[in-house]
Amino acid sequence: MAVQEMGQTSPVYRTMGQQEFNDIAGRILYEDNHLLVFNKRSGEIVQADKTEDECLSTTLKAFVAQRDHKPGAVFMGVVHRLDRPVSGAVIFAKTSKALGRLNEAFLTGQMHKTYWAVVCNRPKEDEKLLIHYLTRNEKQNKTYTSLTPKQGAKEARLRYKFLTATERYFLLEVELFTGRHHQIRAQLSAIGCVIKGDLKYGAPRSNPDGSISLHSRHVRFSHPVRKEEMEIVAPPFCPVMKSCL
């Protein structure tokens, strides 16, 4: 939203209540002048979509403007996205230079991401590299897997590792080597390890809050300006994951 005054367009950000302000502040995992890493909850969207719900980039702009008493525009560039029902670490750039460099790192595989997934069945092998060929159905907003190359399909690679088990579920660590649509959800479902709460890929029931039990746990990348290696760990929200800490 913007207002016009004396020929100048100035951004106007909403004012947060104290409870929301404190919640946002408490979920910032790292911040400096160049970037901000945020712990996203399930249900939040990273970037604006057709729902017209407020996205995190807009929320964080409002937060920074309010916290820093910033009269001008706040830059909050989206480096990568997480699906709406997924939680965990999301990186935002606070300058256009940082955004360009972080986008390049993401696209060239220099950004390493590890996820935690709570699944309904234990995998046959405790650790394995999975390679599938994925085809996206836009109308269904769903991804289908194949073990062999198909026309229009994209290769997807991830490595999972079994970490521990609870009475009913199993916790996997997933290292992502490619960033395809619904990749982890589709590939784990393909080996019979559907993610808890993920009805779209075969879970028997939803989670009470509409989430799926998939969390962006760890990100590692080179700082876009200082060039030092950054490692960020995002605490989980999922009760099953919390019980495994």
Model-inferred region functions:
Residues 1-245:
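RNA pseudouridine synthases
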